[in-house]
């Protein structure tokens, strides 16, 4: 980008949006191939392509913000609005899953045995692994806030410790969720209960993985001295996203695990 005499967000032409779209197409096509033909070749190609695009796109954004100084206060304001709108759209995305769940559970059809959970489905105990996962995500919300306060106070060492702990809690949550899926007595094919449960909690789990990846990039940037007390929107966006994931989990726990069981 040539030298600019204004504070507005004018980006260079970038190949990453179209490459990202192609990688997403490969990934979703690969999922279909995996589901129907048990072939993971296309899915692996899609995931690797997506990872490469993410790394190079992040590299460009880091260069523009940290080294070229293009993320002026005006640009940061626009990025904040963008992140708020993105999180709002994600909230409506999950609203659809809650709608499907309550539509099915509040008036169970004769095909479900006229009851909820449906006949033959043994729900998970909400006081076991789900409760532990709730405690883990709430604790991670505390540690990410601790990291944010440490950055604003210029305490880099403490921020690194807090952010590392947050990431470890995120991966611990993912491991427990995978174990829970493996040990569940029902599958995604077991009536509308299995469908809504696995789709809603599965997409939430995907968001936890995305948030953990986002925070990991922030940790690497923090170690490399990219953040200052006044200039750390990359971390702020990741923290907002992480708090959103926390809140969605609380609604999932209260509705699908506790009330729905």
UniProtKB/Swiss-Prot annotation:
Primary role: Component of the cytochrome c oxidase, the last enzyme in the mitochondrial electron transport chain which drives oxidative phosphorylation. The respiratory chain contains 3 multisubunit complexes succinate dehydrogenase (complex II, CII), ubiquinol-cytochrome c oxidoreductase (cytochrome b-c1 complex, complex III, CIII) and cytochrome c oxidase (complex IV, CIV), that cooperate to transfer electrons derived from NADH and succinate to molecular oxygen, creating an electrochemical gradient over the inner membrane that drives transmembrane transport and the ATP synthase.
Bilayer topology annotation: Multi-pass membrane protein
GO cellular component annotations of the record: mitochondrial inner membrane; mitochondrion; respiratory chain complex IV
Mitochondrial intermembrane face residues: 35-40, 106-128, 184-190, 257-261
Subunit structure: Component of the cytochrome c oxidase (complex IV, CIV), a multisubunit enzyme composed of 14 subunits. The complex is composed of a catalytic core of 3 subunits MT-CO1, MT-CO2 and MT-CO3, encoded in the mitochondrial DNA, and 11 supernumerary subunits COX4I, COX5A, COX5B, COX6A, COX6B, COX6C, COX7A, COX7B, COX7C, COX8 and NDUFA4, which are encoded in the nuclear genome.
Stretches of the chain found on the membrane's Mitochondrial matrix side: 1-15, 67-72, 153-155, 224-232
Catalytic function, reaction form: 4 Fe(II)-[cytochrome c] + O2 + 8 H(+)(in) = 4 Fe(III)-[cytochrome c] + 2 H2O + 4 H(+)(out)
Lineage: Eukaryota, Metazoa, Chordata, Craniata, Vertebrata
InterPro entries linked: Cyt_c/ubiquinol_Oxase_su3, Cyt_c_oxase_su3_dom, Cyt_c_oxidase-like_su3, Cyt_c_oxidase_su3-like_sf, Cyt_c_oxidase_su3_a-hlx
Protein name: Cytochrome c oxidase subunit 3
């Amino acid at each position: 980008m040539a030298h600019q005499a204004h504070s507005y967000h004018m980006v260079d032409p970038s190949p990453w949006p179209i490459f990202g779209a192609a990688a997403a197409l490969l990934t979703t096509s690969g999922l279909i191939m995996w589901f129907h033909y048990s072939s993971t070749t296309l899915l692996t190609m899609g995931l690797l392509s997506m990872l490469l695009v993410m790394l190079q796109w992040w590299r460009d954004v880091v260069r523009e913000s940290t080294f070229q100084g293009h993320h002026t206060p005006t640009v940061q304001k626009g990025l904040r609005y963008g992140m708020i709108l993105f999180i709002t759209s994600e909230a409506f995305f999950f609203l659809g899953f809650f709608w499907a769940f309550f539509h099915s559970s509040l008036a169970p059809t004769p095909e479900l045995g006229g009851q909820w959970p449906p006949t033959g489905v043994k729900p998970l105990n909400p006081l076991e692994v789900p409760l532990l996962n709730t405690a883990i995500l709430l604790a991670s919300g505390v540690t990410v806030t601790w990291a944010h306060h440490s950055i604003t106070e210029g305490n880099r060492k403490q921020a690194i410790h807090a952010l590392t702990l947050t990431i470890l809690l995120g991966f611990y949550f993912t491991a427990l969720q995978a174990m829970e899926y493996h040990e569940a007595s029902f599958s995604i094919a077991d009536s509308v209960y299995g469908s809504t449960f696995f789709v809603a909690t599965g997409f939430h789990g995907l968001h936890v993985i995305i948030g953990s990846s986002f925070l990991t990039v922030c940790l690497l940037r923090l170690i490399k001295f990219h953040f200052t007390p006044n200039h750390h929107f990359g971390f702020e966006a990741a923290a907002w996203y992480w708090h959103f994931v926390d809140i969605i989990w609380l609604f999932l726990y209260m509705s699908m695990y506790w009330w729905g069981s």
